[in-house]
A protein has these predicted regions:
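Catalytic core of pol beta-like nucleotidyltransferases
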Residues: 1-29, 35-41, 51-110
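Short beta-strand->loop micro-motif that forms the acidic, two-metal-ion catalytic signature
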Residues: 45-49
Length: 110
């Protein structure tokens, strides 16, 4: 289970994504070791951003939000966002990709 600080950072990131992406944002999920609660002090914070459209501009905005949120507040760990469309994520699930299955099972919707 993530800590309060990790959840606060993830929520700040989601709010930033909502402002930057608008209706293109579908969902943000925290995944990886911080979502599972077994992170080391130097672990990053993995976040999956699901969008309606696939374009470089949206991916760039997601990374700009991550940089702004993590640097602007002096958080003790790095944000590592991954963005993809819902359609792509569903395809990974259908293809039984472990990455997608882990996120589906362990990811926390923010």
């Amino acid at each position: 289970m993530p800590t309060t600080l990790e959840l606060e950072l993830a929520q700040a990131f989601r709010h930033g994504c909502q402002d930057a992406l608008g209706e293109d944002l579908v969902e943000v999920r925290m995944d990886g070791s911080r979502a599972r609660g077994d992170a080391r002090p130097d672990s990053d914070l993995d976040l999956l951003v699901l969008t309606r459209r696939n374009c470089a501009e949206l991916r760039e905005r997601v990374h700009e939000v991550a940089a702004s949120v993590s640097l602007g507040r002096g958080w003790p760990f790095t944000l590592m966002p991954q963005s993809m469309t819902c359609e792509h994520f569903e395809g990974l699930l259908r293809g039984e990709r472990l990455y997608a299955q882990d996120i589906q099972r362990e990811g926390i919707i923010i």
